[in-house]
Amino acid sequence: MAQTHSFNGRKRVRKFFGKIPEVAEMPNLIEVQKASYDQFLMVEEPSGGRPDEGLQAVFKSVFPIQDFSGASMLEFVRYEFDPPKFDVDECRQRDLTYSAPLKVTLRLIVFDIDEDTGAKSIKDIKEQDVYMGDMPLMTDNGTFIVNGTERVIVSQMHRSPGVFFDHDKGKTHSSGKLLFAARVIPYRGSWLDIEFDSKDIVYARIDRRRKLPATTLLMALGMDGEEILSTFYKTVTYTRDGDNWRIPYSAERFKGMKIISDLVDADTGEAVLEAGKKLTARAAKQLAEKGLKAIKATEDDLFGSYLAEDVVNYATGEIYLEAGDEIDEKVLKTLIDTGETEINVLDIDHVNIGAYIRNTLAVDKNESRQEALFDIYRVMRPGEPPTMDSAEAMFHSLFFDSERYDLSAVGRVKMNMRLDLDAEDTVRVLRKEDILAVVKMLVELRDGRGEIDDIDNLGNRRVRSVGELMENQYRVGLLRMERAIKERMSSIEIDTVMPQDLINAKPAAAAVREFFGSSQLSQFMDQTNPLSEITHKRRLSALGPGGLTRERAGFEVRDVHPTHYGRICPIETPEGPNIGLINSLATFARVNKYGFIESPYRKVVDGKVTNDVVYLSAMEEAKHSVAQANVELDEQGGFVDEFVICRHAGEVMMAPRENVDLMDVSPKQLVSVAAALIPFLENDDANRALMGSNMQRQAVPLVRAEAPFVGTGMEPIVARDSGAAIAARRGGIVDQVDATRIVIRATEELDPSKSGVDIYRLQKFQRSNQSTCINQRPLVRVGDRIHKGDIIADGPSTDLGDLALGRNVLVAFMPWNGYNYEDSILLSEKIVSDDVFTSIHIEEFEVAARDTKLGPEEITRDIPNVSEEALKNLDEAGIVYIGAEVHPGDILVGKITPKGESPMTPEEKLLRAIFGEKASDVRDTSMRMPPGTYGTVVEVRVFNRHGVEKDERAMAIEREEIERLAKDRDDEQAILDRNVYGRLADMIDGKVAAAGPKGFKKGTTITRELMTEYPRSQWWQFAVEDEKLQGELEALRSQYDDSKKLLEARFMDKVEKVQRGDEMPPGVMKMVKVFVAVKRKIQPGDKMAGRHGNKGVVSRILPVEDMPFLEDGTHADIVLNPLGVPSRMNVGQILETHLGWACAGMGKKIGELLDVYRKTANIEPLRQTLEHIYPDNDRNEPVRSYDDDAILMLANQVKRGVSIATPVFDGAVEADINAMLTDAGLATSGQSTLYDGRTGEPFDRQVTMGYIYMLKLHHLVDDKIHARSIGPYSLVTQQPLGGKAQFGGQRFGEMEVWALEAYGAAYTLQEMLTVKSDDVAGRTKVYEAIVRGDDTFEAGIPESFNVLVKEMRSLGLNVELDDTREAEQPALPDAAE
């Protein structure tokens, strides 16, 4: 094969162990957020106008608004967004919200109403754009910037609207009888419950109020008793036949009955079946075929039946008997007396069909619609006297008014499916048919037909994403606004006003602000590393408004459900009280338009698996048999085995291959992103896998990221979708690169309206929400060719476009002197000195100068009573220099605050006389470094209020910023010039000129040489004879001028923003932010973890020479306890270790071959080895077609270790690991002889050694360690505060007191409870005594005792402490006297 393929070295090449081909593309991982919010905002208006969803739907549902008299109406026309005032970075820096102004076009229509006829005619129409507040915009990475911090709106899982049938599992009644209930849940509006009680009467409840008989509800819908019965029951007609009665025979009704008395044919009089026999379905059918039409019935058969219709004397209109009355002797006599020959009774046999509705009707005391409506009114509004109108209006507004009640499209679809109805999904209110169908279904359930619903099924739970949450919130704001508008329309002279005067947008804007600022679902983004960002955006929470609460959620809700397969990850969920309530979306899952989670499947047609992918929700999937992704297939895509393991309706079973109609897309569609990053997940216990998924999110980005040797193939996807690594927006050639930006001249997708230049600004040492460091580094060089989607810069925790959360370290599994007891970790000093686990954290310190009552605070270098030494890092404005090394207690920003006058001591008077005013009236309130923090100042930002004079430092920062903007503008201008003049030269080269610059002869042919004689700006003066070309030249010219103007306008706008003052909180004159970078090396007490839930704390850092070493002298980097593996059952870490060992072995081998090449220039052995490592298949890089440069580049990349990918559930197996170990020339046991670093003796046994990927977690000892001698005290109790943030003390609690009591250490105990805590006078005395060098003191009364006394006095109990000293007590009489 021709060696043509070049390799740019900008991506990590992995050897793939997966055997299953990837058919479906994994959807973008933050699609959930972006798609939802885009659908809500619909910033660009489509050509046919916006569809009724999202923001448009909200406006449509609230408008038009009419005033109370109907004389005027405010209509909604359309909305649009203005461009945002500040871009994302400016909002981050200035603590603003990234948002765009929303303009709504409203139309006010005023009517003339004819007083006599009441007819309306339009008098006046006014249209106007009204500003309706700012709408937060989503950044490209799916986050929001609110007051300068990045936030994420987490999607919420809630119960889908619709109808649900359930029973109480026998818990309500002591007999354990199942009481069935149905509940209609709308998207918004009143809930309707229909339930059985223990006596089998059907009741209805509205909004969980007092229960009413269900028939009351049906009567309120306009039905009467007879109609209700005929709806729920069939009738049987008894016809008088001499002394007896005859009833029609139907096989359906009699099958399965046991005959009590002989079954007699009414026509012939012969017995067709003797008593005591059971009538089987077959026998019943045979009787009908033989011609049995009717059978004889006695009066006894009639007793206990119920009348199906009223018995009325038509002459007088008197009702003798009502429908539903039970037939007994008296009733039957009445019937015969009235001369009835046919009696219709209800078909109730108390076995298949129960008399529940009939009994409910009998208990119901309401007889008419009016009574029923009044009854419902009394339940809903107790204490108000009902009138027919008010009751009717109230009942209508409960379920039938689209303003108050909304099932939503989802609710209607679910209801149609459950009840077999066919209403349009635009019918969003309940109908009479719906309520009847619900009651019918409930009665059928009670009769033993049908199934109850499982509310934890994902077909019954849906996801509310950002867009929908925001839509609901905005609707609330608009409804608040609506009330105000109505009042205003009625109160002012409507003829003279404009829409603007009616609208106060505050409530709408406040609703939005409240949602982003304080909703439970609006969360501070977890930005520790790129994975934690992605996971946070893909999180599904069952908590939040309208959801569950931790306390109420039982086991069932939290449990894994069969429908979670491929939709919600069964592994990733927090440990602790939220377990199972907060979940993560599976890798391939997406949310459909109804809010249900869908998973992709491959279609199986005629037993062959196709590559057609369909997305199905849980409801749709239940109808199919789905085979797993790892089923064996033959060449043609048919199933190899006769029977295939598949899932059907939540059960796993073996099905014949003909019955299988779908197949999973990929084995990793089962798990979430974090779990899909764990290699050998299939070999780990689920509990540990859960910890592994959760701890990867806490890994701190290290100074040098390194991708894992043993990956899963998910790493590049996470790095790209999280936005940590920068991918090229379009292809082109790299024009300029430095540490802060990459400039690319586009060659693909050139659009005349856009500039031909892409400038990518890299983030340098930005602080993340968790104080970790966000820093991006370019991967490209000037002149490189780039294609769309190529990774051009690495971000935090990424390495060549792969996610890299930790480092590969050489591990030995062995005990070492007890230093790895209880999961502790022993590290080599080499790890510290090589900065393997060193991370940079950026702390932000903020100081504000306010205007106080006594005068303004001042930021200055001139601070009273501070030595020159302490000011050495400050500039003349009193702000620390960039690059200064700062220590605890150092001043970062000097600030003085005026203090009130206090009486002066003679010394102060003297000072004032000598030094003048200044010294006395201010106090030092400078911003100092907190204890225990060392670092380097990396950035300073100064913010000034409008109109406040800027200091030197602010001016310098401003100049720098403007220079940077100018450089950007100039670069873009230069590339634009080069492009445009290049195109111009190409267009006129060799053409005949019709005109030209001064001194140019007309009719001459234009050549490049000729053009060089004139400056470029004069080339535009050339005109050509070809008119079409001349038109193109003019178009190019105008496009060039527009681009220049746009560039300049953009530049001026940015400069103006930099120069103008900043919005400040009230009372703040000036604010300074100082960013300090802290370098944290790993040290004892830091928490580390692998990817398999194997976590531990660093216990000791050992000199390299003491660490165990291999025969070749290589020392282990880290020693882990082998006992951490068996009981935890996370064997994945051992397999990873072996495979990592093989990777490093192969890398070493390649390194040796590289050295051979350098000596002999023979590349063949190297090429062969690499081709052997990366066999030719779809998943691996085409190494066979690499040219020599590419081979060398690849060899240099892998000489530290070959990177491999072992996808979850489809990864390397033991044979693969053994083969790789053998290739690398290592023992297949994966064990080596180790020598003790201290003695040089070999250890008794061989030790498992290899490379494992370790992470340093965010629980760093530097953030936790804390000490205090004196510090702040609580105001009331006067005890020291608690916690590091408050610089508090260590609590000597109840149990510690018991310990001292047990020792009898009385004086120590007294000290603890008094002078070391809250004896105010005592502690000052002790301090003075220590200063004097004296060690005697006396304890006084603790302040908490006084608090107790005051508390008792406030309850009215006077308690006084009699402080009588022993000295004043009379001496006891002497015993001798």
From Swiss-Prot:
Key word Nucleotidyltransferase present: yes
GO cellular component: DNA-directed RNA polymerase complex
Alphabetical GO biological process terms: DNA-templated transcription
Keyword rRNA processing: no
Origin: domain of life: Bacteria
Family the UniProt entry places it in: Belongs to the RNA polymerase beta chain family.
UniProt name for this protein: DNA-directed RNA polymerase subunit beta
Organism from which the protein derives: Brucella suis biovar 1 (strain 1330)
Name of encoding gene: rpoB
